[in-house]
C-alpha cells in the first residue's frame, strides 16, 4: 500500500512538472466593446509576447501550471495586468481603457477615418505590413487590399512601382506620411522608390477609397493612403533583417531603439539597403534608406522629430515591350539601346539610369489642452534632387538649342549626346489641427500651408560626339516652378441618438501654381494659374447593434491639373470635379468581419490617361467631359478555427467615359467607352493556416480582369486578365539569448504565369510591362 501511494505521488508530481497549458483570449476596447487587432500580450516579463490577430485574439501555449502574469499593451490604451492561476486551459476576455496620456496617433487622427466616419476604409497594422515586407516597394505590400492593382516596371517589385485603386492611378491617390503630403506637387504622383523600405518604419496605414475625409495635399480622386511611421516602443529593441532571392535581389535592414528613457525620452533608428537585377533586362536597382527619430513623451505633451529618406539608382525600364517582342523575348528592355546604320541594336549605354535622392524632415508637437481639447502642429521640409541620364543618337543641334557645327567644308546638323535631365526641388510648410472629443461629439479643425519652392527643371549635356563651341555641361533647357497650397477644414462627428451618428466635413483649398522656362524640345512655356476649391462632405452612420453598422455619405472633391497636363496636352486642361456616393455595411464578430459597399464616382472634366507617354515615360492625360466609376466591393475576414483564417475581397465595377469623342473615318463620334486601365473585376484572397504555434502558411491569390489600353475601347489595345498565386511561409524560433528568430519564404507566381500588369498604346501599337514568372524571396529576422 505504501509503495503504491509513493508511486502515485511521484507520478502526480512528474505530471504536475510536465503539465503544460494554454492561455487564449480576446482583447477589447472597454468603451466600444470592439476587438483590438495588434495588441501585444506578454507573459511573465517576456518582452517578445504575442500580437492579437484581426479579431483581437491571442494564444500563448506550453505554459507550466501555476501563477502567471499577463501584461496587455496597445497604443492609446492603458496597460493591463492580469494574474492567472493556471491549472487547465484558460480563455480570457480582457478590456482595455483608453488612456488620457497623449499618444502619437493624434498626429494622424485629423486626417483619418474612424468607426463613426461614413466612408469606406481599411486599416493595415504593423504586424500585417511586416509579414509581407520582403523588401518590395510599399504598393506591392498593399496589393492584397480591396480594389487595388499594382505593377512593377522592373517586373520584380523593386525599383519603380505603381498602384491603382478603383482604377485611379497614383496621380489621383492622395498620400500623406504623418499627415504631411507626399505626392509630388507638380506631377501629383508618388515615387515610393525614393524612400525604399519605408514599410519597415511604418506603424500603420489607412486606405480610404473614394473621396474620403478631408486631408492635406491634392484631393483624393480615387483613394487616399495615410501612413503613420513608427510610434513609441517602451522597451529597448534591436532587429536585423536579411533577405535574398531571385534576380539577385538582396535586402539588409537594421533597426534599433532605446525604449522609454526616464519615462520621457525615446530614440529610434533604421538603415536599409536593397539591390536587385530586376526581371527585365538591365532593370537593376540600388536603393538605400534611413529613418531616425527622437521624441519627448510627457503626460500632456509629445514632441517628436523625424528624419527619413533615401537614394535610388535604377536602370531605366520605363518603356515596356510591344506585342511581338513580348511573345519572343518578354524580358527585352529597349532603354539605352544603341543602333547601327542598319537599324539593328549594336549595344546598350551602361548608365541609362535614374539617380535621385530625397530627404524628409518633420517636427510634430501635440499638446493636451484643458477640457476635451488637444492641439497638434507639424513643420516639415523635403529636399529632392537628382537626374536621369540618357544616350541620344542623332540629336539635332536645333533640338539642343545650339547652332550647327561645321568641320572643314561639312556642316553637321546632328550629334550623338549623353544628357542628364535634372530636377532639384524643395517642399516645406506646416500642418495643424485642434481636436475636441467629448464622447458624443468629435470635432476637428485643421489645415495646412505648404510651398513647393525653388524647383528647377534643367538639362545638361555631359558628352557630345560633335561639341563645337559647346561649353562643358551646357544647359540646353531650364525652367523654374513654384506652387503654394493652402487648405483649412472642419470635421464634426456627433451622436444624434445612441444609434445614429452624423458626419459633416467642409474644406476650402486654394492653390497658386507658376512655372516658366524652356522645355527640352526648345519650346518656351509660362504658366500662372490659381484655383479655389470648396469640398463639402456629409454622411450618416446607423449602429444596428454593437456588431453591425450601416453608413452612407456624399462627398465633393475638386483638383487642379498637373504639370504634364499643361505642357503635354493639346488644349489647356480644366480642373476636375468629383461627386462620390458611398453606401456600406460593416459587421464584426469574434469569428468573422464582413464589409459590403456600393460606390458611385461621377466625374466632370476627368483627366484620364490617353494611353500615350511623354518623353520621360509618364502617362499623358486629357479632359473627357463626363465619366463615372461605379461598383460593389465585398471584403471579409473569416476565422474558421484557431488554425484557419481566410481574408478575401472582390470588386465588380463599371468604368465609363460618357461622352468620349472618337474619330471614325475622320468623322467625330461620341461614344460610351470604358475608361483606360480600369478592370471590371478585381479579387484577392489570403488563406492562412497556423500549422502550429510558430509555423504559419498563407496561400495568396489575385485576379485582375481585362483592361483597355486606350479610351477608344479598341480590342487590339487590351491588357489580358490574369490570375496569380503566391505562397508565404513564416516560422519563429525563441532561443535563449535573443527574443526571436524569424524565417520566412515567399514564392511569387507559383504557377509561373506569363502576364503583364500595366501597359499603354502609342500610334495604335500596344506596349506591355511584363512581370516575373515564378520567383522566390527568403528572409531571416533576428530580434534582440
Regions found by a protein language model. Give the residues of each.
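Transmembrane beta-barrel wall of Gram-negative outer-membrane proteins
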Residues: 237, 244-275, 280-317, 363-371
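Short acidic/polar hinge/loop motifs at secondary-structure boundaries
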Residues: 59-62, 181-209, 228
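Gram-negative outer-membrane beta-barrel transporters
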Residues: 498, 600-602, 622-711
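Membrane-embedded beta-barrel scaffold of Gram-negative outer-membrane proteins
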Residues: 368, 374-380, 543, 549-557, ...
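Short, acidic, small-residue-rich periplasmic hinge/interaction motif at the N-terminus
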Residues: 28, 32, 39-44, 73-77, ...
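Extracytoplasmic beta-strand/coil segments of soluble accessory domains associated
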Residues: 139-181, 203
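C-terminal beta-signal and adjacent terminal beta-strands/loops
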Residues: 646-649, 654-656, 703-709, 731-784
Amino acid at each position: 500500500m505504501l509503495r503504491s501511494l509513493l508511486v502515485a505521488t511521484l507520478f502526480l508530481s512528474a505530471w504536475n512538472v510536465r503539465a503544460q497549458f494554454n492561455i487564449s483570449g480576446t482583447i477589447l476596447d472597454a468603451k466600444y466593446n470592439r476587438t483590438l487587432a495588434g495588441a501585444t500580450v506578454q507573459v511573465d516579463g517576456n518582452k517578445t509576447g504575442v500580437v492579437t490577430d484581426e479579431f483581437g485574439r491571442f494564444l500563448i501555449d506550453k505554459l507550466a501550471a501555476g501563477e502567471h502574469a499577463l501584461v496587455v499593451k496597445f497604443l492609446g490604451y492603458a496597460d493591463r495586468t492580469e494574474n492567472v492561476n493556471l491549472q487547465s486551459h484558460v480563455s480570457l476576455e480582457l478590456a482595455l481603457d483608453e488612456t488620457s496620456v497623449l499618444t502619437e496617433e493624434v498626429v494622424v487622427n485629423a486626417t483619418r477615418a474612424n468607426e463613426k466616419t461614413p466612408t469606406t476604409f481599411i486599416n493595415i497594422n504593423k504586424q500585417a505590413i511586416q509579414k509581407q515586407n520582403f523588401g518590395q516597394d510599399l504598393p506591392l505590400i498593399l496589393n492584397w487590399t480591396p480594389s487595388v492593382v499594382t505593377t512593377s516596371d522592373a517586373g520584380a517589385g523593386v525599383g519603380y512601382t505603381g498602384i491603382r485603386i478603383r482604377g485611379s492611378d497614383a496621380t489621383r491617390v492622395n498620400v500623406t506620411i504623418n499627415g504631411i503630403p507626399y505626392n509630388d506637387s507638380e506631377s501629383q504622383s508618388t515615387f515610393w522608390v525614393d524612400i525604399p523600405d519605408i514599410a519597415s518604419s511604418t506603424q500603420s496605414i489607412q486606405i480610404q477609397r473614394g473621396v474620403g475625409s478631408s486631408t492635406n495635399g491634392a484631393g483624393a480622386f480615387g483613394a487616399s493612403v495615410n501612413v503613420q511611421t513608427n510610434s513609441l516602443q517602451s522597451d529597448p529593441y534591436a532587429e536585423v533583417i536579411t533577405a535574398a532571392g531571385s534576380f539577385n535581389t538582396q535586402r539588409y535592414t537594421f533597426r534599433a531603439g532605446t525604449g522609454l528613457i526616464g519615462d520621457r525620452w525615446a530614440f529610434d533608428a533604421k538603415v536599409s539597403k536593397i539591390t536587385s537585377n530586376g526581371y527585365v533586362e538591365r532593370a537593376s536597382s540600388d536603393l538605400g534608406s534611413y529613418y531616425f527619430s527622437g521624441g519627448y513623451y510627457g503626460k500632456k505633451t509629445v514632441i517628436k522629430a523625424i528624419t527619413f529618406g533615401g537614394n535610388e539608382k535604377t536602370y531605366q525600364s520605363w518603356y515596356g515591350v510591344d506585342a511581338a517582342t513580348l511573345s519572343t523575348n518578354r524580358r527585352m528592355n529597349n532603354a539605352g539601346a544603341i543602333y547601327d546604320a542598319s537599324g539593328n541594336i549594336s549595344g546598350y549605354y551602361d548608365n541609362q539610369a535614374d539617380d535621385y535622392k530625397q530627404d524628409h524632415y518633420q517636427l510634430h508637437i501635440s499638446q493636451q489642452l484643458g477640457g476635451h481639447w488637444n492641439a497638434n502642429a507639424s513643420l516639415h521640409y523635403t529636399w529632392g534632387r537628382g537626374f536621369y541620364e540618357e544616350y541620344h543618337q542623332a540629336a539635332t543641334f536645333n533640338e539642343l538649342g545650339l547652332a550647327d557645327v561645321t568641320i572643314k567644308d561639312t556642316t553637321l546638323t546632328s550629334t550623338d549626346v549623353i544628357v542628364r535631365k535634372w530636377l532639384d526641388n524643395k517642399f516645406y510648410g506646416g500642418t495643424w489641427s485642434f481636436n475636441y472629443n467629448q464622447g458624443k461629439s468629435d470635432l476637428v479643425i485643421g489645415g495646412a500651408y505648404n510651398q513647393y519652392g525653388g524647383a528647377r527643371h534643367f538639362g545638361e549635356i555631359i558628352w557630345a560626339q560633335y561639341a563645337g563651341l559647346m561649353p562643358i555641361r551646357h544647359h540646353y533647357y531650364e525652367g523654374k516652378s513654384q506652387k503654394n497650397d493652402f487648405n483649412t477644414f472642419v470635421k464634426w462627428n456627433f451622436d444624434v441618438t445612441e444609434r445614429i451618428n452624423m458626419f459633416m466635413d467642409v474644406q476650402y483649398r486654394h492653390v497658386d501654381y507658376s512655372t516658366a522656362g524652356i522645355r527640352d524640345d526648345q519650346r518656351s512655356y509660362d504658366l500662372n494659374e490659381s484655383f479655389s476649391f470648396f469640398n463639402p462632405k456629409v454622411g450618416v452612420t446607423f449602429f444596428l447593434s454593437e456588431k453591425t453598422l450601416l453608413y452612407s455619405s456624399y462627398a465633393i472633391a475638386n483638383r487642379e491639373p498637373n504639370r504634364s497636363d499643361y505642357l503635354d496636352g493639346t488644349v489647356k486642361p480644366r480642373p476636375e470635379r468629383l461627386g462620390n456616393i458611398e453606401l456600406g455595411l460593416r459587421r464584426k464578430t469574434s469569428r468573422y468581419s464582413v464589409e459590403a459597399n456600393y460606390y458611385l464616382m461621377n466625374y466632370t472634366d476627368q483627366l484620364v490617361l490617353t494611353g500615350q507617354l511623354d518623353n520621360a515615360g509618364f502617362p499623358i492625360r486629357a479632359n473627357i467631359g463626363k465619366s463615372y466609376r461605379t461598383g460593389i466591393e465585398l471584403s471579409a475576414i473569416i476565422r474558421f478555427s484557431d488554425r484557419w483564417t481566410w481574408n478575401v475581397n472582390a470588386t465588380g465595377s463599371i468604368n465609363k467615359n460618357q461622352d468620349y469623342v472618337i474619330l471614325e473615318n475622320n468623322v467625330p463620334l461620341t461614344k460610351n467607352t470604358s475608361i483606360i486601365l480600369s478592370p471590371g473585376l478585381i479579387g484577392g484572397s489570403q488563406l492562412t493556416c497556423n500549422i502550429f504555434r510558430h509555423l504559419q502558411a498563407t496561400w495568396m491569390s489575385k485576379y485582375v480582369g481585362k483592361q483597355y489600353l486606350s479610351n477608344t475601347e479598341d480590342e487590339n489595345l487590351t491588357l489580358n486578365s490574369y490570375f496569380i498565386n503566391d505562397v508565404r511561409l513564416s516560422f519563429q524560433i525563441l532561443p535563449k539569448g535573443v527574443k526571436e528568430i524569424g524565417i520566412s519564404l515567399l514564392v511569387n507566381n507559383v504557377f509561373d504565369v506569363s502576364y503583364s500588369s500595366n501597359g499603354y498604346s502609342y500610334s495604335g501599337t500596344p506596349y506591355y510591362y511584363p512581370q516575373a514568372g515564378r520567383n522566390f524571396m527568403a528572409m531571416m529576422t533576428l530580434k534582440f
